[in-house]
Amino acid sequence: MARKFFGTDGIRGRTNSGVMTAEIAMKVGQAAGTYFQRGTHRHRVVIGKDTRLSGYMMESAMTAGFTSVGMDVVLLGPMPTPAVAMLTRSMRADLGVMISASHNPFEDNGIKLFGPDGYKLSDEAELTIESMLLQELPLADAAQVGRARRIEDARGRYIHAVKASLPDNVRLDGLRIVVDCANGAAYHVTPSALWELGAEVIAIGVEPNGKNINAGVGSTHLDAIKAKVRETRADIGIALDGDADRLIVVDEKCQTVDGDQIMALIGTQLAARGELRGGGVVATVMSNLGLERHLNAHGLTLERTAVGDRYVLERMRSGGFNVGGEQSGHMILTDHATTGDGTVAALQVLAALVSSGKPASELLHLFDPVPQLLKNVRFTGGKPLEAKSVKEAIAEAEARLAGKGRLVIRPSGTEPLIRVMAEGDDADEVEAVVDQICDAVRKAA
């Protein structure tokens, strides 16, 4: 069955158009609420959101949907995606909902669903809910309509949980940390957690107004945090995205440390302590060949999946791995969380920094990345990858890189983009290959 609503990371789109309307949000609430009503207990859903203006509308619409089919609603307000997953489990809820479009601009929004175990739903569950969206579902009797309430201590519960990912004797005293919360969901909790652990915290991206989430700040816009690290002579910078499930680090020299380097650090450190499970790390086809070579040199493997943290997590669960992620900064550490958690990952990096006594620039660049280039080509309709000219360009590029590099071409799961990535030891050849394919896609789009 083809997906109409759910993409690679839930439902996402431009507010008040397509799949992202209040009407559809209410129907998602009704469908998901009906799907998860099992047993005779009073059913409950936990709803969190980021700081987008449309979050109010979507939260209200989903609350109406859930309560109309007899499910009680617990409203968390602005909270990171991993906090929703954690609180879904700890509150014994039947499901969790995060209203967010992650790193996208404020005009977009999205819906992510978590099961009672705190994990994102399976493809099968999402497809079943999709089919229910198109049906007229039975509503609750008047006496069985659900109630909605807000809980006031959600922030404190999450802060306690992320601090518990570190041993009790680990403190961050003496570290000057710049944290950029992207004017998003972590604007309160992450600076608070770092401060409680003893760090000197300089926070930016902590003044959300509904329209400035990810706007020139956060893990996809690093100029702001680099400038602040330089200005304050900070030891390290921690950049999160709008829903705080991804992390990019900036060292004291304002050099970028991406998800591949973070996975290399956490993976090898856990392996040295005998705590790494699965014999390696799980990442996607977009992770740099340098990461694979680094892990192999330490007797570890790199398992690759399709792009999307859900696929990384599926492989981690099936193979018994406890470290996985994406180059873009999704870090999944299943010893501590059931989904990507930028704050938990940041604490592991900071703990390593404290114990090593080294500056971040020495600790966090464990391998030299192979030259890699990623370009996005926007298209307005059709399927450009099926064009004969594009297929021929791809075949020619693969022949040029054979044995010397990798080529990954894929449509975005959330935007009308074709992503073209190549890597290899020859940077000029990598650039030529990417440009060749991008030109072919543009002409076919």
Swiss-Prot record:
Its EC number is 5.4.2.10. It comes from the Bacteria. Keywords: Isomerase, Magnesium, Metal-binding, Phosphoprotein. Activated by phosphorylation. SUPFAM superfamilies: Phosphoglucomutase, C-terminal domain, Phosphoglucomutase, first 3 domains. Catalyzes the conversion of glucosamine-6-phosphate to glucosamine-1-phosphate. This is Phosphoglucosamine mutase.
